Amino acid sequence: MSRQLYLDCDGVLADFDKGAQAILGLPPRAFEKRHGLGRFWAKLASAPDFYFSLPLMPDAMELYDAVKHLNPVILTGLPRGNWAADQKVRWAAQHFPGVRIITTMAKDKRNHAKSGDVLVDDQVRHRDRWEEIGGVFIQHRSAAESIEALKAYFPL
């Protein structure tokens, strides 16, 4: 079976929480709880090049180096509005030149997969939607754990 490997961006390759905390002055979940989701996204959207300026996750290159021979695709969810896609595409080009990136609403990630495809993602919210189409979902906690889990599906 031919499988495609998809890597989520925020929380797997890009350190969303670190970048967001620098803008918000609080950890993202704390800011959202205190000020609401609308203000959370409005503040990030108004920050110049928020997504483009995100740092790499500390172990992002460890994960990527282990799977680059599989030609992974970055499959990343977008917030509402039309402000983030270009920033994410430029971020991927800077950190992972030549790697294909697909930007979509998180709930629609499964529309880009076929049965057997593997997604490494830190957010389990849409796990069921991915698995409904026959995809394999690996919850990312660290590069080491994800690499170990991927060995069941790919030669690493």
Q: Residue locations for each model-derived region?
A:
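Conserved Lys-Pro-Asp/Glu-containing loop-to-beta segment of HAD-superfamily phosphomonoesterases
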Residues: Q4, T103-W130
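Acidic, Mg2+-coordinating phosphoryl-transfer loop and its flanking beta/alpha structural elements
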Residues: V118-K151
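Short, structured coil segments at secondary-structure junctions
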Residues: K68, P97, S115, E132-G134
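Active-site neighborhood of HAD-like aspartate-dependent phosphohydrolases
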Residues: M1-A45, E132
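A short, structured active-site edge motif that brings together acidic residues
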Residues: V73-W83, V89, H95-H112
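Short, acidic loop-to-helix structural element flanking the phosphoryl-transfer center
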Residues: E32, S46-I74, G81-D86
